[in-house]
């Protein structure tokens, strides 16, 4: 039985493409949450903010999730836009002998 606090800081910058907006459009994201491993079953509770953006960034987002026994981060951009993504994810883990 484990609880893991995570904080994900992500930056997306448009570097090309023919869709609306322009090269250099950007958006930043901070997502925080807790993943619980309860007897081998993972669950996640999280919230996300976007502290800064410029240009056309509608629909862009990182998504932190769990699948099976894995923590995942996927990203979603927009049609006809080339976007580069960088992310730092910090995790703090607490293992306990009690049932969560």
How does the language model describe each region?
Residues 1, 66, 78-80:
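Surface-exposed coil/turn segments at beta-strand junctions on protein surfaces, enriched
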Residues 1-35, 84-92:
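Beta-rich globular "head" domains
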Residues 34-36, 58-66:
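Short, exposed beta-strand/loop patches in secreted or surface proteins that constitute
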Residues 37-55, 90-100:
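Glycine-rich, low-complexity segments
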Residues 48-52, 74-81:
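Secondary-structure transition/turn motif
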Residues 65-75:
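Noncatalytic modules at the cell exterior or secretory-pathway interfaces
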Residues 70, 84-86, 96-100:
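Domain-scale recognition of soluble eukaryotic interaction modules
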Residues 76-80, 88-95:
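Mixed-charge, glycine-accented linear interaction segment located at domain edges/termini
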């Amino acid at each position: 039985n484990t609880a893991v606090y995570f904080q994900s800081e992500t930056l997306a910058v448009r570097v090309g493409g023919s869709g609306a907006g322009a090269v250099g459009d950007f958006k930043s994201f901070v997502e925080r949450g807790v993943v619980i491993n309860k007897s081998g079953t993972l669950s996640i509770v999280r919230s996300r903010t976007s502290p800064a953006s410029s240009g056309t960034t509608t629909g862009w987002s990182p998504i932190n999730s769990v699948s099976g026994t894995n923590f995942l981060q996927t990203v979603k951009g927009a049609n006809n836009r080339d976007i580069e993504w960088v992310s730092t994810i910090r995790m703090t883990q607490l293992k306990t002998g009690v049932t969560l």
